């Protein structure tokens, strides 16, 4: 059975409010086993979104993503076979959602968990199989060795390549796409270059226009439920144009922390 892209973690100074944003706008369901002192977890029925407090020395935004596999030992062996320099490390026991952390050839970090084991205690496990009208469709990664990283995720995790006529790589687990975009400093002409790493998340929705209306209603109900402005000023306009090059989204916004989100039907 191919691996499953099972969660995304977003670091935020306002992590409870940011989780509430996803719950309110995208209909994600809150975990029935909350751990509010550590994180707030919501889910769409397939992917869990873990809103975590930003720790010292760390940046806000998308922190990492998670992959669920059938056999951890076999997966770690596959990682080492792909490149002996790649490593995995066991996570502390207080982290119930994943057993190990690992990285790809460009040092993009991801979590590893095994299906049907006891420590998957949260929304990732409890909502399995339920489809919600608004759900995460893709996770975008912008990285220098895009082709090599794509080979890594295909060979190690069995993700399926999707053919598209552009220079990006699209890998699917059957429901969610890992989009790998080549990082080039030339793409950042007219703006501050962003570090390589996780770039944005995308949602598939029943109606883009309804999402826009729901955003207006949400801000009217609670003025704190407002994402960051996009496309303002020359640099902001350049950032938005780069973001809009992703062919998987047609409406662009951010969460409260500034994490980039694109939406399509």
Positions of PLM-derived features:
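Structured core of small recognition/catalytic domains
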Residues: 147-231, 235-245, 249-251, 256
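Short, charged/polar, Gly/Pro-enriched secondary-structure boundary elements
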Residues: 46-50, 57, 107-110, 120, ...
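Fold-core signature of tandem repeat domains
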Residues: 5-8, 26, 40, 62, ...
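Core segments of cupin and vicinal oxygen chelate
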Residues: 2-48, 94, 140-185
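Exposed loop/turn and edge beta-strand positions of beta-sandwich/beta-sheet ligand-binding modules
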Residues: 4, 61, 96, 135, ...
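N-terminal beta-strand motif that seeds the catalytic metal site of vicinal oxygen chelate
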Residues: 1-16, 62-65, 115-150, 177, ...
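Helix N-cap motif at beta-to-alpha junctions
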Residues: 14-15, 69-73, 145-146, 206-210
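Vicinal oxygen chelate
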Residues: 80-132, 170, 216-265
């Amino acid at each position: 059975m191919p691996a499953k892209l099972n969660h995304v973690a977003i670091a935020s100074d306002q992590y409870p409010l940011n989780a509430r944003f996803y719950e309110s706008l995208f209909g994600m369901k809150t975990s029935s086993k909350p751990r509010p002192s550590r994180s707030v977890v919501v889910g769409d029925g397939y992917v869990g979104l873990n809103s975590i407090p930003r720790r010292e020395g760390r940046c806000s935004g998308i922190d990492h993503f998670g992959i669920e596999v059938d056999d951890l030992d076999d997966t770690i062996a596959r990682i080492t076979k792909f490149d002996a320099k790649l490593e995995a490390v066991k996570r502390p026991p207080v982290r119930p959602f994943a057993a190990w952390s690992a990285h790809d050839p460009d040092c993009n970090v991801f979590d590893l968990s095994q299906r049907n084991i006891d420590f998957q205690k949260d929304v990732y496990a409890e909502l399995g199989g339920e489809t919600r009208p608004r759900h995460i469709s893709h996770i975008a990664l912008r990285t220098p060795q895009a082709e090599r990283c794509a080979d890594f995720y295909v060979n190690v995790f069995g993700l399926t390549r999707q053919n598209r006529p552009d220079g990006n790589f699209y890998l699917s687990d059957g429901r969610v796409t890992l989009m790998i975009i080549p990082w080039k400093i030339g793409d950042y002409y007219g703006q501050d270059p962003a570090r390589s790493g996780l770039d944005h998340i995308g949602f598939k929705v029943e109606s883009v226009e309804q999402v826009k209306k729901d955003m207006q209603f949400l801000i009217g109900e609670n003025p704190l439920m407002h994402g960051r402005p996009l496309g303002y000023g020359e640099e902001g306009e350049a950032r938005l144009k780069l973001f809009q090059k992703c062919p998987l989204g047609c409406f662009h916004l951010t969460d409260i922390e500034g994490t980039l989100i694109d939406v399509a039907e």
